Structures are given as C-alpha cells and as structure tokens.
C-alpha cells in the first residue's frame, strides 16, 4: 500500500500529543520552542524565542544543538506553518527519545491568527 503525505501526517498525529495554541502559550515559560519550518519561513516571522531546525535536517541536527544536548526529557513545543511538518517532527523526536515533545496544532498560522506575539 502506497501512502500519501497526508496519510503519514495522520498516522503521526495518532501517535503523538498535539496541543492547541492556548496550551502552547501556557508552556512558554518552561518549554523549548522548536520551529521546523525552512529558514526563509522562520526569517519572515516566528514565535519569540523559537529555535529553528528545519524538518529535513532535524534527525541530523537535534543532538548537536546546544539547547538540546543531554536534555531528552525537556519539554519541547514543536511547530511549523500549519501542523503537518510539526506532527512528523514530533513523531521523530519521540522516537529519538525526546519524550516530552508535543506538536502545536495549527502551527504558526494558528498562533498568528490568534493575535499572539511574533518576532
């Protein structure tokens, strides 16, 4: 059976914890924010304090990033533009041992649409 990108996202969402914008906002004081969008998307606007590691490089860069080294139990809120890439990224992070990683449903778009602060 051949899967589509949407199938992969749906499967990932069944295996991860997904939180809404309000819950993500409540975690800001204690969680790391991980933006898995491309650098140009990040430069155009991102959540304050977010760390940018694009989805395509995540598996290769996460363990060497100073904010994540030796911190597999840290709370991580992962987001992308609308929630698909962040679901896939969160699934991978969980598989890599980052068990407290969660995906923000709706992504950057939902955050901005809620009128919340962006850099």
Walk through the language-model features, giving the residues of each.
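Rhodanese-like catalytic fold shared by cysteine-dependent sulfurtransferases
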Residues: 1-32, 39-77, 84-119
């Amino acid at each position: 059976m051949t899967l589509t990108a949407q199938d992969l996202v749906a499967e990932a969402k069944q295996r991860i914890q997904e939180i809404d914008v309000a819950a993500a906002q409540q975690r800001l004081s204690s969680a790391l924010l991980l933006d898995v969008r491309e650098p140009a998307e990040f430069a155009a606007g991102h959540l304050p304090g977010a760390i940018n590691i694009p989805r395509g490089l995540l598996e290769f860069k996460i363990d060497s990033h100073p904010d994540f080294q030796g911190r597999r139990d840290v709370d991580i809120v992962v987001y992308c533009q609308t929630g698909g890439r962040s679901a896939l990224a969160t699934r991978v992070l969980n598989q890599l041992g980052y068990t407290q990683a969660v995906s923000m449903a709706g992504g950057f778009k939902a955050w901005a649409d809620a009128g919340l602060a962006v850099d």
